[in-house]
Amino acid sequence: MGPAPESSEFVHRTWVQCENESCLKWRLLSPAAAAAVNPSEPWYCFMNTDPSYSSCSVSEEDFPEESQFLENGYKFVYSQLPLGSLVLVKLRNWPSWPGILCPDPFKGKYVTYDQDGNVEKYYVEFLGDPHSTAWMSAAFVGHFSLTLEAADCTKKKRWYRSALEEAYQLYRCSAEQRLEVCCLSKPNRAKTDTKAAVVTKKGMQVSKINTEKKRPRVRKRKRDAALKCSVEIFCSDEALSKENMVVSETEGLLKELEKMLQQIQEPTAREDESQGEQLSQCSPESPTGSPFQSYHEEDYIVPDGAGLKAGEYIEIITNNLKKIDALISEF
């Protein structure tokens, strides 16, 4: 604990940070020394007019707590940190946690002020996997330093490590680049969250807004067209194969009928010297609308040297015609 604040030692004095990446300590300057600092140029510890704190190897000087200033009638006023600043937030029962100052998606601002117009709270998106957000008192929010040593974290160690690693990566980024990382603070996310679901009194979810982008239907159409084409080709091939089989069977039956007709049309009356009998000749003529005319059951013909009744030939021909009709009816 440093000297008592009532000594006016800290009144009107200015804190300046050393820009040496291996130091980044804050030094307390007198009004005269602070007036000599050029804001557009980097400042280092060796430029400090106070020899006690003019080296990067010297620790930061102690500074009284805010409560001590309040007890002695002083008001602690915090300078406003810019939007997108990488900060370190003091938490209760947790180690100091890195975060980014970003706008509240509902209020649209990242800082609030008290009645006197001084900074009161900041909206912080805490880093790590996963991110989280909260409004924090300005008294607990300060600049993040690369010299920060990882504190002992008794719970959620992996979460804490991921937060520090992300902070180190974002340290050299611009404020705009850091704000791009703040996924929980996007204005459109607030609208999405408020319309995410409509729930009935019984707690049954009746509708949801699908925030995912719809997949293009072009590929589906192409896939359906290709599938339809392949099915049509398969069906046409199958039908063609079946048609060829039917045609082949029909041709076989027609050849058989043609052979039988040729045998019927040949003159069957032959001279039988031993018996003197003459067989009657069948001469089929095809009337309109019927492939064959009627035959007498008692007539005889001689195909291939065997004697058969004409009625049996008619029955064979009729059966073959029925088979042809059955094959044709399939189409």
Swiss-Prot record:
Xref: SUPFAM superfamilies: Tudor/PWWP/MBT
Compositionally biased spans, kind Polar residues: 276-293
Zn finger (CW-type) start-end: 9-64
Swiss-Prot/TrEMBL domain comment: The CW-TYPE zinc finger mediates its binding to trimethylated histone H3K4me3.
InterPro entries: PWWP_dom, ZCWPW1/ZCWPW2, Znf_CW
Keywords noted in UniProt: Metal-binding, Zinc, Zinc-finger
Region ranges (Disordered): 264-295
Gene Ontology molecular function, alphabetical: histone H3K4me3 reader activity; methylated histone binding; zinc ion binding
Gene3D superfamilies: 2.30.30.140, 3.30.40.100
Residue span(s) of domain PWWP: 83-147
Positions bound to Zn(2+): 18, 23, 45, 56
PANTHER family listed in its UniProt record: ZINC FINGER CW-TYPE PWWP DOMAIN PROTEIN 1, ZINC FINGER CW-TYPE PWWP DOMAIN PROTEIN 2
Taxonomy of the source species: Eukaryota, Metazoa, Chordata, Craniata, Vertebrata
Protein name: Zinc finger CW-type PWWP domain protein 2 homolog
Role of this protein: Histone methylation reader which binds to non-methylated (H3K4me0), monomethylated (H3K4me1), dimethylated (H3K4me2) and trimethylated (H3K4me3) 'Lys-4' on histone H3. The order of binding preference is H3K4me3 > H3K4me2 > H3K4me1 > H3K4me0.
